[in-house]
Amino acid sequence: MKLTCMMIVAVLFLTAWTLVTADGTRDGLKNRFPKARLEMKNSEAPRSRGRCRPPGMVCGFPKPGPYCCSGWCFAVCLPV
């Protein structure tokens, strides 16, 4: 019973994670990987365009990415 509950919670969490990190467009996951490849190729691009958030700003779930200038987020942007 506990294992079943844990599996249900895990599936719900992963579903929410996918919906939160997906683009706002229709079929957002379809075009997600080419964009990620481009950002990996030019890793300084998001920072140079001013789209990153400074340390202390709210950023969402814990994830590495271009959303924070430092690249690390745990509810707020963490300093390096």
Curated annotation (Swiss-Prot):
Residues that bear 4-hydroxyproline: P64
Expression sites by tissue: Expressed by the venom duct.
Disulfide links within the chain: C52-C69, C59-C73, C68-C77
Signal peptide: 1-22
Location of this chain's protein in the cell: Secreted
A single cellular component GO annotation: extracellular region
Predominant place of localization: secreted
Bilayer-crossing regions: none
Propeptide section residues: 23-51
Family matches, as InterPro entries: Conotoxin
A GO molecular-function descriptor: ion channel inhibitor activity
Keywords: Disulfide bond, Hydroxylation, Knottin, Neurotoxin, Secreted, Signal, Toxin
UniProt keyword Disulfide bond, yes or no: yes
Assigned protein family: Belongs to the conotoxin O1 superfamily.
Domain notes: The presence of a 'disulfide through disulfide knot' structurally defines this protein as a knottin. The cysteine framework is VI/VII (C-C-CC-C-C).
Protein name in the entry: Conotoxin MaIr193
Originating organism: Conus marmoreus (Marble cone)
